[in-house]
Swiss-Prot record:
Subunit structure: Fungal cytochrome b-c1 complex contains 10 subunits; 3 respiratory subunits, 2 core proteins and 5 low-molecular weight proteins. Cytochrome b-c1 complex is a homodimer.
Miscellaneous comment text of the record: Heme 1 (or BL or b562) is low-potential and absorbs at about 562 nm, and heme 2 (or BH or b566) is high-potential and absorbs at about 566 nm.
Residues binding heme b b566: H96, H197
A GO cellular-component term linked to this record: respiratory chain complex III
Cofactor remark: Binds 2 heme b groups non-covalently.
UniProt GO BP: mitochondrial electron transport, ubiquinol to cytochrome c
Database matches in InterPro entries: Cyt_b/b6_C (IPR005798), Cyt_b/b6_C_sf (IPR036150), Cyt_b/b6_N (IPR005797), Cytb/b6-like_sf (IPR027387), Cytochrome_b (IPR030689), Cytochrome_b_C_euk/bac (IPR048260), Cytochrome_b_N_euk/bac (IPR048259), Di-haem_cyt_TM (IPR016174)
Name under which the protein is recorded: Cytochrome b
Keywords (A to Z) from UniProt: Electron transport, Heme, Iron, Membrane, Metal-binding, Mitochondrion, Mitochondrion inner membrane, Respiratory chain, Transmembrane, Transmembrane helix, Transport, Ubiquinone
Residues passing through the membrane, by range: 32-52, 76-98, 113-133, 179-199, 225-245, 289-309, 321-341, 348-368
Keyword presence, Cytoplasm: no
Chief place of localization: mitochondrion
Cofactor(s) demanded: heme b
Amino acid sequence: MRLLKSNSLLRLVNSYLVDSPQPGNLSYMWNFGSLLAVCLVIQILTGCFLAMHYTAHVDLAFNSVEHIMRDVNNGWLIRYTHANVASFFFIFVYCHIARGLYYGSFKEPRTLTWSIGVIILILMMAIAFLGYVLPFGQMSLWGATVITNLMSAIPVYGQDIVELIWGGFSVSNATLNRFFSLHYILPFLLAALAVAHMIALHVHGSGNPNGLNAGDDRFPMHPYFIFKDLVTIFAFLLVLSIFVCFYPNALGHSDNYIPANPMVTPASIVPEWYLLPFYAILRSIPNKLLGVIAMFGSLLILLVLPLTDLSRVRGNQFRPLMKLSFWFFVVDFIILMWIGAEHPASPYLEVGQIATAFYFAWFVFIVPAVGLFENTMADINKL
């Protein structure tokens, strides 16, 4: 312990992971940060090992993945761990964001922490999309074609941008090389942003379920919260091992086990399940450009939440009306996820349009309206 406080580098680690004061009433909802850190470490390690055996070539990529599965010692374990942890990564991120929305973690003085978190989410989605293309199965090829073609909606320069991304006039060897290079390097940028996220959080410390200033009611990170984090980490590793060993493809898509064929279009082109809500928003708007704007806007709108939440009370713990609207929002997000996996035909198209309208209305109208109503009622009760 003396070394932790005397060494300049270890002293920094000590201030973040050992002696960091945390509110005494933190629930298990505050454990997602440590779970996400574990996921990021697993993804970087397994990704590095996979890159040692992967070949970024349109004629060899699919076979190199099969080589990893069949010939590399424990290659199946590395690949299935990488694929399934990606899904758990997004499960934990969505839960982490939901906790932030519910407990008002986006409000001052933690707005910077929230903003960095939103940037991390967007970067995660980009990395996930790049990785989905690398096995170069049917869904990889056609998913890359459809998603990159969205850039063609940009006026004047759209098609030029698409061809710049492709490195040619279609998804080709140059595209696969670019995607592999970016998929390898961007997780390290993600790790840097995660450190920045933690530094920003460390300035004012964690919030708590009551939304109040914890004051002196704090305990050191170690051993109390470290062991609390270990409970959920071991639970996660247990569930992950069940998926990897018994249901490795439960969260994937069967069409990606068919080699990419530009002459045959799959019956349904869908991204991975964790991108489906935003894919549903994209498809719910008939105009291509407006659909692309709405899809990116559905992520960027999280940045304006600190401005639109006008309530004087932090979080929804003591706000029954806002608590109800929050659960409506969660249901709406699940509906969008369901719609994103369906064909864009009636009645799914109409349901998707209603769900998309509610998604944006929640941020722009419902959150500020409920906040103003609660503030007004509080002022009336004071009279």
